[in-house]
Amino acid sequence: MDLKTVTGAAVELSDTAFGREFNEALVHQVVTAYLAGARQGTRAQKTRAEVSGGGIKPWRQKGTGRARAGSIRSPIWRGGGRAFAAKPQDWSQKVNRKMYRGAMQCILAELIRQERLILVEEISVSGPKTKELIAKLGELNASRALIVTKEVDENLYLAARNIPHVNVLDTSEVDPVSLIAFDKVIMTVEAAKQFEEALA
């Protein structure tokens, strides 16, 4: 597959890594699993059995005119236990390496088809200057963008840190969610070659 950088230089990338047909079910499964794995799973609530108190019947069964009640810790009472109490649980899902690789291939190929992937020879700033990076993003028409480089340049990272909807990652940090979360993905040729090597 032949692609062009912003300056018009031709870049040849493998069809396996960047030309795969989009598989929505696969991408959905991998993204869902990734988001599930990010959940803390530490939520804990008490059932009526675990809430303190409520051992005695609050009033007799008949003759008071009130609705019958057996415990002040019933789920319908204020201060009662939860009917279906949440407990700590592990939300992580298993994703095979082959599935993960396939989802990444699908997403990268779809970014190219939708013209959301911008290839550049390099992207850098002279110092940690946000204004300079905003100007460069303006030239590329990418105000909400993920910048992917082979290795994160500290100046670039610091310059992007204060811009909303802009993030800088190196190839080892990129995941399916980060790729689809931005309108545009600005990728250096070096980073694209590294993805080609990892995904081909």
UniProtKB/Swiss-Prot annotation:
GO molecular function terms noted in the UniProt entry: rRNA binding; structural constituent of ribosome
Signal sequence segment: none
Organism, scientific name: Psychrobacter cryohalolentis (strain ATCC BAA-1226 / DSM 17306 / VKM B-2378 / K5)
Protein family membership: Belongs to the universal ribosomal protein uL4 family.
Keywords: Ribonucleoprotein, Ribosomal protein, RNA-binding, rRNA-binding
One cellular component term from this protein's GO annotations in UniProt: ribonucleoprotein complex
InterPro entries, alphabetized: Ribosomal_uL4, Ribosomal_uL4-like, Ribosomal_uL4_dom_sf
Matches recorded under Gene3D superfamilies: 3.40.1370.10
GO biological process, one term: translation
Protein name (database record): Large ribosomal subunit protein uL4
Region (Disordered): 45-64
The keyword Ribosomal protein appears for this protein: yes
Key word Membrane present: no
Coiled coil stretches, renumbered: none
Function statement: One of the primary rRNA binding proteins, this protein initially binds near the 5'-end of the 23S rRNA. It is important during the early stages of 50S assembly. It makes multiple contacts with different domains of the 23S rRNA in the assembled 50S subunit and ribosome. Forms part of the polypeptide exit tunnel.
Complexes and interactors: Part of the 50S ribosomal subunit.
